[in-house]
């Protein structure tokens, strides 16, 4: 019959006995045949062939009905997986088609035929195959891959065709997609509900078909609200299985693992490796139950059946004790087999267990489609594959291994059986029956054998109740009262914790190592001697020197008693034996310690950095209050810069600036803008380390709105223009910003570089400068000459005072750039020198080694360059200082070539373009030389000279090497195009001559390896008298080539006038036997033709066209 003839090949090729051996559905990608997989299925090749031949012979005996043919396509990955191939879709479909065509009760009015459509394992290929057979079949059996089921259903609905698939789910009521089996998720859910297991993981094979199956299964389980702890796919080999086992170990409370892959009982290697790994990792000790997914799709034989794979593999047999196999139930004797045997269509000794399990699923799908088509024709719809799902109602017919029962809603109601092993035998024992119509699991009397003796613990029943919200296995309504009580207790505890914390904070202000409030008893106030320095304009930013010109010793000699009366006249004190500085508030102003103020003070107290003065506490007295700060004896940066007796070189300045940048960067990283940064607020300690002070002072005043007079214009010279233009506060300009600090840093950079006050070069008053800065244009900035510091530092300074705040760099950027300017020097000058000396002494040996390696590297580079310019032997002699003696070579072949029209091309091109195209051309030629035994002598302009047989003699191979090279160069030259003039061809001509010559080095400066002798002149004459795209060969070279008998193709040119030689017989080298590259076609030139003028005119025309296009 036609169906049998199309059973193996999708395009209708004959399937006869000889084709069976190479039929792709029966043979995997590695040549794995049914004989090699007899552990998976006991189908014998001989029985299958015998069965197929009998069916074919039987079909030939049927009369040929003159009826219309209804062709169905069987979709599946039959050609990419040996296990899928074992389903034998052609045999299964043929058996069902024969039954349908011979069933008198089915009045189809048409002849049922089929085509096998292999789709591959990946979803895109499968969908493409499906679309390609739109017009070749009337309905489809499949898809097997659920990944393209939605797309296939939509396309089939538009085409007016139906899909009968056991792997795709569909809404009730039929339509384009007709499921031949119930939802696999519902089947698994019924089993899980029976055993009380809700927490699951899904592990799939790496194949696209199984990954998609796992994803859709997870979606279905999530729709039921089940907790999925893991969805993953196996990697290659044991390593991938081990990784999955580790992931399963990490999932808490896991009960079941659904395995979306081929069953180990059917030869599934991935499931076998995974189960062995699970046993090795201790996952098969009873804590988990493994459920294979693929066995849900077919009836797995189990009656009087032993699986050799369990007998032959002890670890797998032990691991399979943790597996529950759910499969369609099978009857003792299939009606399909009974009918076939009665009519002699199969061997008498062939039983149902010898058929691959998916075989029966395909068979049942065809039977179901035939009955739907029969019902459709009976109701007058006609022979059509559309809406067949609407014609499957209340059906009860014999299937392959059990009866096919369809209820009134079109749902199939098969019976599933749960199979188990005891970990020792190789047989599957039925323990439960699942009735799909009631979704109830009934025991059969044999208990499930769980490893360890007991099943995994049951999960909360709320997971399976659709009317109950289940959160982590707990019903929220039952715990609502507990949650309410917990919240109330938490609120009460929170209030108690707040008040306790508030009390502890108040206590921490006065006690402990991190206390903030200091008492007069903790400070020793010292009377200051009269100052001989000029007073500072900013009373709140006084110099940090101990006595403004005195020393600590003079202060101690003046007074060592605690005299509170001196407090109004001093800014220094002793605290815990260390000097401290008092940053006083305005007279009569007592700070209000609000929560915001205390938070700011605690933040300041916690700040510790080498370049930020430490805040030690707050002193609140009856008349005077002050911040207690770390003391720096060398005064402010402004004092240091104004001291003309102190010499400051760049190293010193860079050290101070780097300290300033580090301190400000630290404040910004702590989200603490300064707001009042100036050279007076930068102090220097005895080690010449610069520290930033007065940080937080403005914020503290703002936190409790303390009054302070407006600062003088001289105090605003460091202020950013946007702050000057902003709303004024009672104590100064606008709120502190990070970008405002960057501007102030730029002004300090100008002070350090010039050692002059800000904007000193303008010669204007501070008030006028502030007005110009706040109201540009013109832009008013300090002027710094290039000789007052490194150019990079001046450029960085100018970036810092950009008008737009967003254009100014961040402190991280400033720090990185300044480190590069300062070459990574440390902050302290003395420390930097000591560290430098120590580093130098420690790294001297490494430095010597590094320089030695660099010298060796340069030596190698020099030798490599010398060897590229001269032969290795000559280069070695020159390097050793020995004389290079000229050498006579009795037989060499020399190659000359040039570019026809090069002079015209050079005249019409820019010099840089000429160099570029010559470099491209000669680079291509040089690449050809690498594969031949030749030596490149030189290139002069467009002339290219190569020789073979020197400096290394190669016997009589010199002519062949040059000839092969010349042919290859000519082949590449024919396709070469100039980058600046791609439409202008490059025509190369070459000349070859063989003979003796002398080679030697000429000169001491830029020595050259030169060739001398008449052979060189003759080769040059051969090139100059040649023609474009031609290889001009002398008689000597021709004789050398013919003596080698390598199949060179040589044409006689005739007598040619050679300068200094007269007329000589010359030849053209046109090819070689076995040379496969194409050669450019030479110009047809007759004697006396002005071919050079024609070529030059062609070049000019090409450049003119290029100029017009440009």
From Swiss-Prot:
Activated by Ca(2+). Activated by NCALD in a Ca(2+)-dependent fashion. It comes from the Eukaryota. Keywords: Cell membrane, Cell projection, cGMP biosynthesis, Disulfide bond, Glycoprotein, GTP-binding, Lyase, Membrane, Nucleotide-binding, Olfaction, Sensory transduction, Signal, Transmembrane, Transmembrane helix. Specifically expressed in a subpopulation of olfactory sensory neurons. Expressed in the cilia of the olfactory epithelium. It catalyses: GTP = 3',5'-cyclic GMP + diphosphate. Residues 67-475 are extracellular. It is found in: Cell projection, Cilium membrane. Residues 880-921 are annotated as: Interaction with NCALD. Its EC number is 4.6.1.2. One of its GO terms (biological process) is receptor guanylyl cyclase signaling pathway. Coiled coil: none annotated. Residues 893-1023 form the Guanylate cyclase domain. PROSITE patterns: GUANYLATE_CYCLASE_1 (PS00452), GUANYLATE_CYCLASE_2 (PS50125), PROTEIN_KINASE_DOM (PS50011). It holds the Pfam family PK_Tyr_Ser-Thr. GO terms for cellular component: ciliary membrane; non-motile cilium; plasma membrane. Glycans are attached at residues 304, 374. Residues 501-1110 are cytoplasmic. Interacts (via the catalytic domain) with NCALD. Functions as an olfactory receptor activated by a urine odorant, uroguanylin. Activated as well by the volatile semiochemicals carbon disulfide (CS2) and carbon dioxide (CO2). Has guanylate cyclase activity upon binding of the ligand. Activation of GUCY2D neurons leads to the cGMP-dependent activation of the CNGA3 channels, membrane depolarization and an increase in action potential frequency. Signaling pathways activated by GUCY2D may trigger social behaviors such as acquisition of food preference. The protein kinase domain is predicted to be catalytically inactive. This is Guanylate cyclase 2D. The lineage of its organism: Eukaryota, Metazoa, Chordata, Craniata, Vertebrata.
């Amino acid at each position: 019959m036609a169906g049998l003839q199309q059973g193996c090949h999708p395009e209708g090729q004959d399937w006869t006995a000889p084709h069976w051996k190479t039929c792709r559905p029966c043979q995997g990608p590695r040549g794995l045949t049914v004989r090699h997989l007899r552990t998976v299925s006991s189908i014998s090749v001989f029985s299958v062939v015998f069965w197929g031949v009998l069916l074919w012979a039987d079909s030939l005996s049927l009369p040929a009905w003159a009826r219309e043919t209804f062709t169905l396509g069987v979709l599946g990955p039959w050609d990419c997986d040996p296990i899928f191939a074992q389903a034998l879709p052609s045999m299964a479909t043929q058996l069902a088609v024969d039954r349908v065509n011979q069933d008198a009760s089915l009045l189809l009015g048409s002849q049922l035929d089929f085509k096998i459509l292999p789709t591959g394992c990946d979803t895109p290929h499968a969908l493409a195959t499906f679309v390609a057979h739109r017009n070749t079949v009337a309905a489809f059996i499949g898809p097997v891959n659920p990944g393209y089921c939605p797309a296939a259903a939509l396309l089939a609905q538009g085409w007016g065709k139906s899909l009968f698939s056991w792997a795709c789910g569909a809404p009730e009521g039929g339509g384009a997609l007709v499921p031949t089996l119930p939802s696999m998720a519902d089947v698994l859910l019924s089993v899980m509900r029976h055993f009380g297991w809700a927490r699951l993981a899904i592990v799939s094979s790496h194949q696209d078909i199984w990954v998609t199956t796992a994803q859709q299964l997870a979606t279905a389980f999530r729709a039921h609200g089940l907790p999925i702890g893991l969805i993953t796919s196996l990697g290659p080999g044991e390593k991938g299985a081990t990784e999955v086992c580790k992931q399963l170990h990490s999932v808490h409370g896991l009960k079941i693992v659904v395995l979306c892959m081929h069953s180990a009982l059917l030869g599934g290697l991935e499931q076998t490796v995974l189960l062995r790994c699970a046993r090795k990792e201790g996952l098969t000790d009873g804590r988990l139950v493994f459920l294979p997914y693929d066995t849900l799709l077919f009836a797995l034989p189990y009656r009087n059946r032993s699986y050799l794979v369990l007998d032959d593999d002890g670890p797998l047999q032990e691991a399979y004790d943790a597996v529950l196999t759910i499969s369609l139930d099978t009857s003792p004797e299939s009606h399909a087999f009974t009918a076939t045997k009665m009519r002699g269509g199969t061997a008498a000794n062939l039983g149902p267990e010898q058929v691959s399990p998916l075989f029966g699923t395909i068979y049942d799908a065809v039977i179901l489609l035939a009955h739907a088509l029969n019902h459709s024709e009976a109701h007058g719809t006609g022979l059509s594959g559309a809406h067949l799902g609407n014609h499957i109602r209340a059906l009860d017919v014999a299937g392959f291994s059990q009866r096919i029962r369809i209820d009134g809603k079109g749902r199939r109601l098969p019976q599933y059986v749960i199979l188990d092993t005891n970990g020792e035998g190789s047989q599957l024992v039925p323990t439960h029956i699942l009735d799909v119509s009631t979704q109830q699991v009934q025991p059969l009397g044999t208990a499930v054998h769980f490893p360890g003796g007991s099943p995994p613990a049951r999960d909360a029943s709320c997971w399976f109740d659709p009317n109950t919200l289940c959160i982590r296995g707990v019903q929220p309504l039952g715990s609502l009262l507990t949650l309410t009580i917990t919240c109330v207790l938490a609120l009460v505890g929170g209030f108690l914790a707040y008040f306790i914390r508030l009390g502890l904070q108040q206590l921490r202000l006065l006690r402990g190592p991190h206390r903030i409030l200091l008492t007069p008893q903790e400070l020793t106030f010292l009377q200051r001697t009269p100052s001989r320095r000029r007073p500072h304009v900013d009373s709140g930013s006084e110099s940090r020197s101990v006595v403004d010109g005195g020393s600590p010793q003079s202060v101690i000699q003046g007074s060592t008693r605690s005299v509170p009366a001196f407090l109004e006249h001093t800014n220094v004190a002793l605290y815990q034996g260390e000097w401290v500085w008092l940053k006083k508030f305005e007279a009569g102003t007592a700070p209000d310690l609000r929560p915001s103020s205390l938070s700011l003070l605690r933040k300041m107290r916690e700040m510790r950095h080498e370049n930020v003065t430490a805040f030690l506490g707050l002193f609140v007295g009856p008349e005077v209050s002050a911040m207690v700060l770390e003391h720096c004896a060398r005064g402010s940066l402004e004092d240091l810069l104004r001291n003309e007796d102190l010499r400051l070189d760049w190293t010193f300045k860079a050290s101070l600036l780097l300290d300033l940048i580090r301190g400000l960067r630290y404040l910004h990283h702590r989200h603490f803008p300064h707001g009042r940064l100036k050279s007076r607020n930068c102090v220097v300690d005895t080690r010449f380390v610069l520290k930033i002070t007065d940080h937080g002072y403005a914020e503290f005043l703002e936190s409790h709105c303390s009054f302070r007079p407006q600062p003088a214009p001289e105090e605003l010279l460091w202020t950013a223009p946007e702050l000057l233009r902003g709303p004024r506060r009672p104590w100064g300009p606008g709120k502190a910003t990070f970008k405002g600090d960057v501007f102030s840093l730029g002004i300090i950079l100008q002070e350090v570089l010039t050692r002059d006050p800000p904007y000193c070069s303008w010669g204007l008053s501070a008030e006028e400068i502030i007005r110009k800065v706040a109201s540009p244009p013109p832009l008013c900035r300090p002027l710094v000459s290039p000789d007052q510091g490194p150019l990079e530092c001046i450029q960085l300074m100018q970036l810092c005072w950009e008008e737009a705040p967003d254009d100014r760099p961040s402190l991280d950027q400033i720090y990185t750039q300044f480190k590069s300017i300062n070459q990574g020097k440390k902050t302290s000058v003395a420390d930097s020198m000591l560290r430098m000396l120590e580093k130098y002494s420690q790294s001297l040996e490494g430095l010597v080694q590094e320089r030695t390696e660099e010298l060796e590297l340069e030596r190698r580079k020099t030798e490599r360059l010398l060897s590229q310019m001269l032969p290795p032997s000559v280069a070695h002699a020159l390097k050793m200082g020995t004389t290079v003696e000229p050498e006579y070579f009795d037989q060499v072949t020399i190659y000359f070539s040039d570019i026809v029209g090069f002079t015209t091309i050079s005249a019409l091109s820019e010099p840089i373009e000429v160099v570029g195209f010559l470099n491209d051309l000669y680079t291509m030629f040089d690449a050809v030389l690498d594969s031949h035994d030749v030596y490149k002598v030189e290139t002069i302009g467009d002339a290219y000279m190569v020789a073979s047989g020197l400096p290394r003699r190669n016997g009589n191979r010199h002519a062949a090497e040059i000839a092969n090279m010349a042919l290859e160069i000519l082949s590449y030259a024919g396709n070469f195009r100039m980058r600046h003039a791609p439409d202008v061809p490059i025509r190369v001509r070459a000349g070859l001559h063989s003979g003796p010559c002398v080679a030697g080095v000429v000169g001491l400066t830029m020595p050259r390896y030169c060739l001398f002798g008449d052979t060189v002149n003759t080769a040059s004459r051969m090139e100059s008298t040649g023609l474009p795209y031609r290889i001009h060969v002398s008689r000597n070279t021709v004789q050398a080539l013919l003596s080698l008998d390598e199949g060179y193709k040589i044409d006689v040119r005739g007598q040619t006038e050679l300068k200094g030689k007269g007329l000589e017989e010359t030849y053209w080298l046109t090819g070689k036997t076995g040379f496969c590259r194409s050669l450019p076609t030479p110009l047809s030139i007759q004697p006396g033709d002005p071919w050079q003028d024609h070529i030059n005119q062609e070049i000019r025309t090409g450049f003119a066209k290029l100029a017009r296009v440009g």
